[in-house]
């Protein structure tokens, strides 16, 4: 029996919606990255974009474990000499674009390259509970029910 290799024309993408309220960032990002890549499907092919379209709502209500909320630091460089910048997870979540914490976590779990960039375009993250994708009839994915450690008990 030959190894199965999916063709791009045979790919069937589903729409999945995830409510991120109270979910742990890293665990949620891992599940989202797996969905975006298509590794949850039996038809997974490494060089084909056969993952699902993922919508995440309430991304501003994700939680960190331990002291990461105040201690985790995100770095970037402006390109100028001495231009290293940093911001904590707390500053980002309380700032203007809190959904970037989750986007960055998922981005770092997806392979870098042309295919990874195309798969990241299938991710839509919204800080609030509203999203413009009702017409796609997304199926709800209950991440909290998959494992009790996915939810932070306060």
UniProtKB/Swiss-Prot annotation:
Gene Ontology annotations of biological process type: negative regulation of translation; translation
Gene3D superfamilies in UniProt: Ribosomal protein L13 (3.90.1180.10)
Domain of life assignment: Bacteria
Keyword ATP-binding: no
Keywords (A to Z) from UniProt: Ribonucleoprotein, Ribosomal protein
GO CC terms: cytosolic large ribosomal subunit
Gene Ontology terms, MF aspect: mRNA binding; structural constituent of ribosome
Keyword RNA-binding annotated: no
UniProt xrefs under Pfam families: Ribosomal_L13
Chain segments annotated as coiled-coil in the UniProt record: none
Sequence similarity: Belongs to the universal ribosomal protein uL13 family.
NCBIfam families assigned: rplM_bact
Reported function: This protein is one of the early assembly proteins of the 50S ribosomal subunit, although it is not seen to bind rRNA by itself. It is important during the early stages of 50S assembly.
Subunit structure: Part of the 50S ribosomal subunit.
Protein name per UniProt: Large ribosomal subunit protein uL13
